[in-house]
Amino acid sequence: MTPRYRRVVLKASGEALMGKQGFGIDVSVVDQIAADIADALSLGVEVGVVIGGGNIFRGVAVASKGGDRVTGDHMGMLATVINSLALRTSLAKIGVEAVVLSAIAMPELCESFSQRQALAYMDAGKVVIFAGGTGNPFFTTDSAAALRAAEIGADALFKGTQVDGVYSADPRKDANAVRYDHITHDQVIRDGLAIMDTAAIALARENNIPIIVFSIHEAGGFGAILRGGGHCTIVDDDPAAQQQASA
């Protein structure tokens, strides 16, 4: 079958990798994400991945306690490299070739990012894991995911979250929260819906990249959406889709 998208970037938060632990990496969660990526590859989809570092370190936590935000963000970038290496290991266990490209140079551990190299690896059928955020402080890994998606010409940016789409409020706290099947980038920004930071959403909008919000914890969910089904919210500016969703 023909997948809905041919080239995608998958963004997963560092917190998602913790599973039910309070810190660090739950290998079973990383293995599940790896299996979902392998499923996408079986459809002929080219996959890039960005993982946050919040399960290990968050730069804003340093700043909130009076520390230097720049140093804190640099520490957070290192955490994303750890998570990226963990995912590469899980992919290798199931025979999937993956390469980690980092925005910060650390040649003993991984290659440095370049758009040309990323595209070459994806054309060769390898998973490309983008580590180190954007390489600059004050930018989130959500912004890094949107940036990499634009750089490689991705058809969509998949945002794996704790819930199965975009809601008007946190459904885990508000029983009256309304789930959206389809919503625009502008509405997400205007209503302050906390799926990604504003810079990431604006970058996706400017480059006509739809954001697919789904549950990272639903095994097989990634592939189901690529096959045209699944549970998700599509964030884009397609007027026809908006009209259909509101009908």
Curated annotation (Swiss-Prot):
Activity modulation: Allosterically activated by GTP. Inhibited by UTP.
Residue positions binding UMP: G53, D73, T134, G135, N136, P137, F138, F139, T140, T141
Alphabetized GO MF terms: ATP binding; UMP kinase activity
Pfam families assigned to the protein according to its UniProt record, in alphabetical order: AA_kinase
GO cellular component annotations of the record: cytosol
Region feature Involved in allosteric activation by GTP, mapped onto this chain: 19-24
Subcellular location: Cytoplasm
GO biological process: 'de novo' CTP biosynthetic process; UDP biosynthetic process
Keywords: Allosteric enzyme, ATP-binding, Cytoplasm, Kinase, Nucleotide-binding, Pyrimidine biosynthesis, Transferase
EC number: 2.7.4.22
Pathway assigned in UniProt: Pyrimidine metabolism; CTP biosynthesis via de novo pathway; UDP from UMP (UMPK route): step 1/1
Residues involved in ATP binding: K11, A12, S13, G14, G54, R58, T161, Q162, Y167, D170
Signal peptide (residue range): none
Catalytic reaction annotation: UMP + ATP = UDP + ADP
Main location: cytoplasm
CDD domains on file: AAK_UMPK-PyrH-Ec
UniProt xrefs under PANTHER family: URIDYLATE KINASE (PTHR42833), URIDYLATE KINASE PUMPKIN, CHLOROPLASTIC (PTHR42833:SF4)
Quaternary structure and interacting proteins, as annotated: Homohexamer.
NCBIfam families: pyrH_bact
The protein's role, per its UniProt record: Catalyzes the reversible phosphorylation of UMP to UDP.
Similarity remark: Belongs to the UMP kinase family.
Protein name in the entry: Uridylate kinase
Organism the protein comes from: Chelativorans sp. (strain BNC1)
